[in-house]
């Protein structure tokens, strides 16, 4: 499985998502939208908004949280094959 996480250091939901991935020993490539040229535009092009974190799992874009409500642990566990 290839996992890419679009994030930024100031994003609380991004930090929570990365803690979840670390807890389950899931490797991923992180793309910081503040540092990588055109990364924010890529997020907008695929999702229609500049919202992070965004996960790309084997080429499929997934938003693992609801703004103001937090990270979706159960949904991401299913998508990542965590029991």
Could you say what each language-model-derived stretch is?
Residues 1-26:
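Local sequence-structure signature of Cys/Sec-based thiol-disulfide redox active-site neighborhoods
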Residues 12, 38, 71:
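Short alpha-helical
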Residues 12, 34, 63:
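Nucleotide phosphate-binding site architecture
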Residues 15, 19, 41, 74:
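Alpha-helical elements of the RecA-like P-loop NTPase motor core of helicases
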Residues 28-30, 61:
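Conserved beta-strand scaffold positions in the cores of enzyme catalytic domains, especially
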Residues 32-50, 56, 78-83:
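Thioredoxin-like thiol-disulfide oxidoreductase module
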Residues 44-51, 62-68:
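Thiol/disulfide oxidoreductase modules built on the thioredoxin-like
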Residues 57-83:
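Non-catalytic, surface beta->alpha helical segment in thiol-disulfide oxidoreductase systems
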């Amino acid at each position: 499985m290839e996992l890419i996480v679009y994030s930024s250091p100031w994003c609380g939901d991004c930090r929570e998502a990365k803690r979840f991935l670390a807890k389950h020993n899931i490797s991923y490539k992180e793309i910081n939208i503040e540092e990588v040229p055109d990364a924010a535009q890529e997020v907008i092009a695929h999702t229609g908004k500049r919202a992070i974190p965004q996960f790309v799992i084997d080429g499929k874009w997934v938003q693992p949280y609801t703004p103001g409500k937090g990270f979706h642990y159960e949904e991401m566990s299913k998508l990542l094959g965590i029991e």
